[in-house]
């Protein structure tokens, strides 16, 4: 939308692609992350693991992310018209980026936690870093750093007039793109590239260790468990790379084109469409995180089944719902 001052870029696809995809992300993200929070917070558990702390914070970040989508859905459906005022414009842009970057940073924390557990399971320093206290400290640090990192968005994002229509600039207005450009690169490097390198390095190291242990295992049972762990690690890595990588590459390319060759309307149109098309893909990561959380653990899948059993009231006798846990059955009211 900020390109209308220079080039008549094509924006009709946004009235269909973004509202539909954001609406789907909103519904799925709200349900899945709400379920994850219920399983980790509302159930009375005796103790919290470090992974639960990280995943709870990740679910909160994803939940806040999807809650910022409804104004964007309405605005995109109305052709970028922004009827909500300047304060909500700044707030939506801030929370959109804040929780996107929190998600990447918490995924980096989870990857480091798992890396230490797999590659250095008995090293004293690694064991100390995997405690609940360290997880709480790391989570607080992530929220603080992400808020500080995204705070300039409150200055750059604002409402403005384009073709006699009030819009909410996603990055900043066209006149300030030269000033915004260094900050945009900062977000790409510090906000995305650093967590990306951490996640890829940790999971690649884990896959190497798990592969070597599986190859040297004589018993079928440990080998099968490690193969499952290996497939989980690979799946998480692929989700992270495919969700976050293309979006940030397209966004960075768009920044360079927007600043260096703003008069090349054809090129600008191509890179802007590419950037906008990848936005829904990065949004779907907030739906994938809860699925990976439940899929990667038998105990968590049992928790989810217990919740579904309670919700659907599958009873074998009045007032009793049976939930299979391991090889035994437990009954609850």
Where are these regions (language model features)?
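Hydrophobic alpha-helical transmembrane segments
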Residues: 54-55, 107, 135-140, 182-186, ...
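Extracellular N-terminal segment of 7TM GPCRs
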Residues: 1-35, 333
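Loop architecture of class A 7-transmembrane GPCRs
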Residues: 1-11, 76-93, 97, 120, ...
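Cytoplasm-facing ends of alpha-helical transmembrane segments in multi-pass membrane proteins
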Residues: 30-41, 59, 66-70, 98-122, ...
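Intrinsically disordered regulatory tails of 7TM GPCRs
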Residues: 1-9, 126, 140, 162, ...
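Intracellular effector-coupling site of seven-transmembrane GPCRs
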Residues: 60, 138-139, 168-177, 188-191, ...
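Extracellular TM2-ECL1-early TM3 structural module of rhodopsin-like
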Residues: 11-23, 47-112, 117-128
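Helix-to-loop junction signature of class
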Residues: 22-26, 36-39, 64-80, 93, ...
